[in-house]
Amino acid sequence: MSDAAVDTSSEITTKDLKEKKEVVEEAENGRDAPANGNAQNEENGEQEADNEVDEEEEEGGEEEEEEEEGDGEEEDGDEDEEAEAPTGKRVAEDDEDDDVDTKKQKTEEDD
């Protein structure tokens, strides 16, 4: 029984947080947005227009992807940059491991 009470209180907390988040978003946007995020009346026509623009951008994005496939040089350049970043991190991690090994060796020598 006490478990059910805990679940109910956590649900209320979640709902409260969602409501607060919506209020903050409305204040930031400077306009009232529907709670469900869907534009259902004329007052929210701006959201409908935004959705149409997003669809157009998505269509344009597909064309850009096709163009990028033809240019192998650009893709290779991007991949090189991405490959360098993780390598640098690995080097730092290896340095830390070396420090630990050094400490272990000193301990073994002392014994």
Curated annotation (Swiss-Prot):
<feature type="region of interest" description="Disordered">
    <location>
        <begin position="1"/>
        <end position="111"/>
    </location>
</feature>
<feature type="cross-link" description="Glycyl lysine isopeptide (Lys-Gly) (interchain with G-Cter in SUMO2); alternate">
    <location>
        <position position="103"/>
    </location>
</feature>
<feature type="compositionally biased region" description="Basic and acidic residues">
    <location>
        <begin position="13"/>
        <end position="31"/>
    </location>
</feature>
<feature type="modified residue" description="Phosphothreonine">
    <location>
        <position position="13"/>
    </location>
</feature>
<keyword id="KW-0539">Nucleus</keyword>
<dbReference type="InterPro" id="IPR004931">
    <property type="entry name" value="Pro/parathymosin"/>
</dbReference>
<feature type="compositionally biased region" description="Acidic residues">
    <location>
        <begin position="43"/>
        <end position="84"/>
    </location>
</feature>
<comment type="subunit">
    <text>Interacts with NUPR1; regulates apoptotic process.</text>
</comment>
<keyword id="KW-0007">Acetylation</keyword>
<dbReference type="GO" id="GO:0006325">
    <property type="term" value="P:chromatin organization"/>
</dbReference>
<keyword id="KW-0832">Ubl conjugation</keyword>
<dbReference type="GO" id="GO:0140297">
    <property type="term" value="F:DNA-binding transcription factor binding"/>
</dbReference>
<feature type="modified residue" description="Phosphoserine">
    <location>
        <position position="9"/>
    </location>
</feature>
<dbReference type="Pfam" id="PF03247">
    <property type="entry name" value="Prothymosin"/>
</dbReference>
<dbReference type="GO" id="GO:0005654">
    <property type="term" value="C:nucleoplasm"/>
</dbReference>
<feature type="modified residue" description="Phosphoserine">
    <location>
        <position position="10"/>
    </location>
</feature>
<feature type="modified residue" description="N6-acetyllysine; alternate">
    <location>
        <position position="15"/>
    </location>
</feature>
<dbReference type="GO" id="GO:0042393">
    <property type="term" value="F:histone binding"/>
</dbReference>
<feature type="modified residue" description="Phosphothreonine">
    <location>
        <position position="102"/>
    </location>
</feature>
<dbReference type="GO" id="GO:0043066">
    <property type="term" value="P:negative regulation of apoptotic process"/>
</dbReference>
<feature type="modified residue" description="Phosphoserine">
    <location>
        <position position="2"/>
    </location>
</feature>
<comment type="similarity">
    <text>Belongs to the pro/parathymosin family.</text>
</comment>
<feature type="modified residue" description="N-acetylmethionine">
    <location>
        <position position="1"/>
    </location>
</feature>
<feature type="modified residue" description="Phosphothreonine">
    <location>
        <position position="8"/>
    </location>
</feature>
<dbReference type="GO" id="GO:0140713">
    <property type="term" value="F:histone chaperone activity"/>
</dbReference>
<feature type="modified residue" description="Phosphothreonine">
    <location>
        <position position="107"/>
    </location>
</feature>
<comment type="function">
    <text>Prothymosin alpha may mediate immune function by conferring resistance to certain opportunistic infections.</text>
</comment>
<feature type="modified residue" description="N6-succinyllysine; alternate">
    <location>
        <position position="15"/>
    </location>
</feature>
<keyword id="KW-0597">Phosphoprotein</keyword>
<dbReference type="GO" id="GO:0005829">
    <property type="term" value="C:cytosol"/>
</dbReference>
<keyword id="KW-1017">Isopeptide bond</keyword>
<protein>
    <recommendedName>
        <fullName>Prothymosin alpha</fullName>
    </recommendedName>
</protein>
<feature type="modified residue" description="Phosphothreonine">
    <location>
        <position position="14"/>
    </location>
</feature>
<feature type="compositionally biased region" description="Basic and acidic residues">
    <location>
        <begin position="101"/>
        <end position="111"/>
    </location>
</feature>
<feature type="modified residue" description="N-acetylserine; in Prothymosin alpha, N-terminally processed">
    <location>
        <position position="2"/>
    </location>
</feature>
<feature type="modified residue" description="N6-acetyllysine; alternate">
    <location>
        <position position="103"/>
    </location>
</feature>
